[in-house]
Amino acid sequence: MLDIFIDADACPVKEETFRVALRYDLRVFLVANAPLRLPPQGRVELVVVPGSFDAADDWIAERIDQGDIAVTSDIPLAKRCLDKGARVVPPNGRQFTPANIGAALASRALMQDLREMARADGTALRGNAPFSAQDRSRFLQELDTVINAVRRGR
């Protein structure tokens, strides 16, 4: 069964995901560390996982399965989901795949090292680019594409 798991605490595309899931009549697990507002319609279940920093990630990784979709920008969580045969669509719409997750993990580690070095010598590094309307549009298109691919068994 195709379910969508949202790593929800900082996800900017929750409402968009709800609308797409409603159109396809899919169940959505909104996984967060604190209560969030749910849409009035659809098959959305809020899962509040208090505790450790990675509690939401662990809940998703333990339950996601082949053919499910994760909505997350968390690269280590994306890797865990891909390892279980799930598909991963981050909010920017640039899908994580088995072919590109290694490079994403390496880039993340490099940026983490650069931030630590910059902090040590007082240098400021720019953060990620702001979330844009183009990102939102690309996310909607990619989520739709992935849902249809999973339904066709691809």
Swiss-Prot record:
Q: Which InterPro entries match?
A: UPF0178
Please report which protein family the annotation says this sequence is part of. Answer: Belongs to the UPF0178 family.
Protein name as it appears in the record: UPF0178 protein RC1_2062
